[in-house]
Amino acid sequence: MPKKAVVLLSGGLDSSTVLAYALNKGFEVYAISFDYGQRHLKEMKSSEAISKFYNVDRKIVKVDLRSIGKSALTDNIEVPSRDISTIEEEIPVTYVPARNTIFLSIAAAYAESLGTNEVFIGANAIDYSGYPDCRPEYFNAMENALSLGTKIGLKEKFHINVPLQYLSKADIVKLGVKLNVPYELTWSCYKGEEEACGECDSCQLRLKGFMEAGFADPLKYSKYPEFYSKNLVKLRPLKRR
């Protein structure tokens, strides 16, 4: 009988790849998505589409982080457009205070209710926006805290699986292509428009990943950054098996 695992599923490129990865490793996957008052609610539709594609159970948890505020993802603060070369220089206004700590705590509670000590998250510490709760030392500390603070953790160590942690965005895309991830169903843009903006950190890092992997991103963008548009003709269309 396969072991159960809870996968944090936002509907983005990374979390969708991790869900496919966990399934490929033989886990019985239970997805969990968070409606936290984010402006880019389109990602919730993507997480629904991904969970239906893979036919996995998906739990939606509402945690209104707008009451805490101080993030461009939840407040009326402009989402910045930065040069991709400067993205990791400082923590941007899109950082949501303690978001991963809140989400992982709830995901761990869900996992414990299912009788498992396995949680998967699609965080990455290579091509990322510099969020402090995406670093390896953070996940090590959080894993120890959950092992100490849960009933199941007293019997066996709680595992926060971060399989994409040391992969570049290009490597993540390549892994997803190998796993046949339906990237056309995913959503990464921080803005909740009909088309992805192509300017926010998340869009640029995603496009950089596809470009360096040699594939064209299947999503529609209202604007492409120059580094991507000048290489677009060289990129292969993404075709799933």
UniProtKB/Swiss-Prot annotation:
Its EC number is 6.3.4.20. InterPro entries: QueC, Rossmann-like_a/b/a_fold. Pathway: Purine metabolism; 7-cyano-7-deazaguanine biosynthesis. It holds the Pfam family QueC. Its cofactor is Zn(2+). SUPFAM superfamilies: Adenine nucleotide alpha hydrolases-like (SSF52402). It catalyses: 7-carboxy-7-deazaguanine + NH4(+) + ATP = 7-cyano-7-deazaguanine + ADP + phosphate + H2O + H(+). GO terms for molecular function: ATP binding; ligase activity, forming carbon-nitrogen bonds; zinc ion binding. Coiled coil: none annotated. ATP binds at L9, S10, G11, G12, L13, D14, S15, S16, T17, V18, L19. It is an enzyme of class 6 (ligase). The keyword Metal-binding applies. Belongs to the QueC family. Catalyzes the ATP-dependent conversion of 7-carboxy-7-deazaguanine (CDG) to 7-cyano-7-deazaguanine (preQ(0)). NCBIfam families: 7-cyano-7-deazaguanine synthase QueC. This is 7-cyano-7-deazaguanine synthase. It comes from Thermoplasma volcanium (strain ATCC 51530 / DSM 4299 / JCM 9571 / NBRC 15438 / GSS1). The lineage of its organism: Archaea, Methanobacteriati, Thermoplasmatota, Thermoplasmata, Thermoplasmatales.
